[in-house]
C-alpha cells in the first residue's frame, strides 16, 4: 500500500492526541504536519516522535519549522488526509483552509457543518475533496447508511446531568460537569454534552452530511454510549452500529476508509447495552431550542448559537458564571441576532455573523454578571 501523508489540525487536543495514537499503530500513514495552541511540551513530543518537519503553533518549538498560518502549513505539506480537530469557530476557518489543499478531510470539527455546512460542501465538491466524519455517531451512520432510508437515530450519553434531580443542575460547578459518564473529551465538548448542545450540533451535522430533513433524524439517550447510530430502512430493516466508546476507532476509520486496518477491543454479548431513553425537555432545554432554530432554516441563528455557546462555556469553565446561565446567554444572543433577519450568502457573511454574535454575547454576559 502506498504511504499516505497526514496533517492534524489541533494535535494537542483530545481528538488530536488520540489521532496521534492511532497513526502510531497504523502502517503506511505518515504524520507530516501539525497545528496546536500553546501546549509546547506535548507538541514538541509529537514533532520529535514522528520527525514532523513543519508545524503551526502558538509557541516556538526547539525542533521543526514553524509557519505563520494553517494555510501555509497545508500549502507546504499538501497532505492526503487532514484531520480537522480544532474546536469552535477557529475550527471552521481551519476546515475551509484544508479544503484548498487536501484530498480527504477527517472531520471532527462539527462547527464546520453547523456554521458553514453549505459552503463546506460546495468547496469540497469543487475541489474534489472527500469528507469522512470522525464523530462516533456520524461515523456510525456513514458506515451503515444506504439510500432506501426511512430515518436515522443518533444517540447521546446525557452527560453529567443525566441522572441528577432537575433542581440541582443550574448550580453545578465545572468540576461536577466535567465528570462525563462514558467519554474522555475536551472541556467545551464535555460541557456541551451536559447541555446536549453537542447533540444539537450533531443533528445539524447529520442533516448536512447526509442531506436528511430534520424530521428524519431522531435522538435517544443510550446511557453507556454503546449504540452509536441506527439506520431504519423502508423495508423494515434496522441497521445498528455499536461498540465500546473509544474515539480511536472512528478516527482510524476516517483514515483507512474504505478498508479497516485498526485493531481494538471487541465487546462480548453480555456487555451489550441496547437501552434507548427519550430526551427530557426540562433537563436539556438548549437542545430543543437549537432544534427549533435549525428547523426554521436560519443559518445566521446557527452561527450565533455556536458563538454564544463557545463564549458562555468558557466563562463557565473559568467559574465566572453558573452552569444554569449558559442557556440564558445562548438563547438571548440567538434571539437578538434573529431580530436582525440576516441572510448568509457567502463565507464572508459567515465570518461577519460570528463577529456580530460575539459582540452581542459579551453584552448579554455583562448584563448577567452585573
UniProtKB/Swiss-Prot annotation:
Q: Enumerate the InterPro entries for this protein.
A: DXP_reductoisomerase, DXP_reductoisomerase_C, DXP_reductoisomerase_N, DXPR_C, DXPR_C_sf, NAD(P)-bd_dom_sf
* Binding site residues for NADPH: 12-15, 37-39, 111, 186
This enzyme's EC code(s): 1.1.1.267
Record: residues binding Mn(2+): 135, 137, 202
Q: Which GO terms describe its molecular function?
A: 1-deoxy-D-xylulose-5-phosphate reductoisomerase activity; manganese ion binding; NADPH binding
Record's keyword terms, sorted: Isoprene biosynthesis, Manganese, Metal-binding, NADP, Oxidoreductase
The job of this chain, per UniProt, is described as: Catalyzes the NADPH-dependent rearrangement and reduction of 1-deoxy-D-xylulose-5-phosphate (DXP) to 2-C-methyl-D-erythritol 4-phosphate (MEP).
Residues binding 1-deoxy-D-xylulose 5-phosphate, per UniProt: 110, 136-137, 157, 180, 193, 198-199, 202
Family to which this protein belongs: Belongs to the DXR family.
Catalyzed chemical reaction(s): 2-C-methyl-D-erythritol 4-phosphate + NADP(+) = 1-deoxy-D-xylulose 5-phosphate + NADPH + H(+)
Q: Which organism is it from?
A: Fervidobacterium nodosum (strain ATCC 35602 / DSM 5306 / Rt17-B1)
This protein's name: 1-deoxy-D-xylulose 5-phosphate reductoisomerase
Which cofactor(s) are needed, names only? Mg(2+); Mn(2+)
User: What is this enzyme's class at the first EC digit?
Assistant: oxidoreductase
Gene that produces this protein? dxr
What Pfam family is a match for this entry?
DXPR_C
- Which positions are tagged coiled coil? none
